[in-house]
Amino acid sequence: MRDSLARNILLPTAPSLGAIACLLLAIAIGLLLLPRSQPHCFPPGPPVKPIVGSILQVSPQGAWYKFSEYQKVYGDLLFFRGLGSHVLVLNSMKAINDLLDKRSSVYSNRPTFTVVGELMGLGQSMPLLPYGEEWRAHRRLAHSALSPTAVRRYHGIQEDMAALLCMRLLREPEAFFSHVRLIAGNIILSVVYGLPVETSEDEYIAHAERTMQVIGKATVPGAYLCDLMPFLKHLPSWVPFQREASTGREMIERLVTKPFEHVKRAMEAGSAPPSVTQDLLSTNIDDMHDVEQRIKWTTGAMYGAGGETTYSTVLVFIMAMALHPEKQQRAQQEIDRVIGIERFPRISDRAHLPYVNAVIKETMRWHPVLPLSIARMSAQDDLYDGYSIPEGTVVIPNIWGIANDCPRATEFDPERFLNEGAPVDPSSWAFGFGKRLCPGKFLGENSVFILITALLAIFDITPNSSEDLQPDFTLDLVSYPRPFKCRIQPRSEGHAQLAISRAAQRSF
């Protein structure tokens, strides 16, 4: 009885077999009559391996070099996939403009950086906030404080800091890494919080440097396996990346909170000097409950990112001048002709120094300090140039590849920006794209200009005779020269006295 019942349940009868066959035939005919959809046609990329795909074929450290090699094989669009993720690398300015600028509504989001964003807490900061209302609120605050008109009030601070840099280099030229770090950080601290400091060992400068090193390593896409497999964030606290994340969270919270609270206390005491934070807190005082946290994180983003890129760019410039004294001499001749040797450079001189501006552009092109910018993420499925780009694809602009897409790319040649057929101006890619364009662009450009122009005006930068200087750069999110030696000497006693005199006039 039981066996008979089992056979009746498990084995179809002849009529039921016929019904099933008819059903399958009907389905097959229906499928043949349906319009055929094309399979996903992803952009080209390295061969896909079982399970992991191609996503792990490039090390996060210095990935821009490998991306540029792959461009020669696969072209301007480079696609990786695996472990449930898709990554699209943009290797041309056209592709970047088409997607990040013209389709900014689709490509203005950020990927979820599980470690640095969620576990370390940096996801509250404007650079990593998802595209939406909260991000727009942060953006409005930053724009109001850093518009082209607003940053003019900080010209004096930036010029004072340039003079202070020169004075410190006169006293201790071999410590130029430390001096540039101090001055780049000091500009940001003074502008954002009204907090000038005296040494590079100051707790604000030193802590910002350590914190930005942590952020720089963690913000490179794929730096942690947890970024590719977010469920790993639930692993216990003793796992190494969890310990790193916990330390990073404490460092980031201190970075954004301590100077902010300093300004609040100074405002309560009536002793707060002018600053971005003071302005924003004063302007939004009637709505403080809603915006104080936003102001803290908006100004914290300025503090963390602003000094780092200025520091890196000036170090690249010093290296380039030590390697190319003939370019330095031509820039000095222009400064002597336009400004003379009776006064210190000013930001207002910028429009009258075309060759100096070309030197700055070439510095930015020769080694971009943000070689991969900061990754984006597609908000929906998209089609570009005949290729499918799935929703949630991480999109990386290969800035280093674009900067090197010109004749004699390894040569330092400012003249290329003064001739016909000049490369794309680095300012069009150095500060981001579309709706994610860095609001600190104008402040940053002014800082780089006045620091570089002051160094050209006052000093001769030459190689160290005991060391063969070879360009060598770090491989993190922000890339700058590894420690190197060079000689930084005043052009004359008169130039040295000019720097000392101007530094004595500073307002702090």
Swiss-Prot record:
InterPro entries in the cross-refs: Cyt_P450, Cyt_P450_CS, Cyt_P450_E_grp-I, Cyt_P450_sf, Cytochrome_P450_fung
Glycosylated sites: N464
Annotated signal peptide: none
Keyword Transcription: no
Pathway: Secondary metabolite biosynthesis
Binding-site residues, heme: C438
An annotated Gene Ontology molecular function: heme binding
EC number, UniProt record: 1.-.-.-
Cofactor dependency: heme
Transmembrane segments: 14-34
Entries under PROSITE patterns matching the protein: CYTOCHROME_P450
Location (main, coarse): membrane
Localisation per UniProt entry: Membrane
Membrane topology: Single-pass membrane protein
Alphabetical UniProt keywords: Glycoprotein, Heme, Iron, Membrane, Metal-binding, Monooxygenase, Oxidoreductase, Transmembrane, Transmembrane helix
Disulfide bonds: none
Keyword Glycoprotein set for record: yes
Pfam families linked: p450
GO cellular component, one term: membrane
PANTHER family: P450, PUTATIVE (EUROFUNG)-RELATED, P450, PUTATIVE (EUROFUNG)-RELATED-RELATED
Family designation: Belongs to the cytochrome P450 family.
Protein's job: Cytochrome P450 monooxygenase that is able to use 3,5-dimethoxy-trans-stilbene and 3,5,4'-trimethoxy-trans-stilbene as substrates for oxidation.
Listed name of the protein: Cytochrome P450 monooxygenase 74
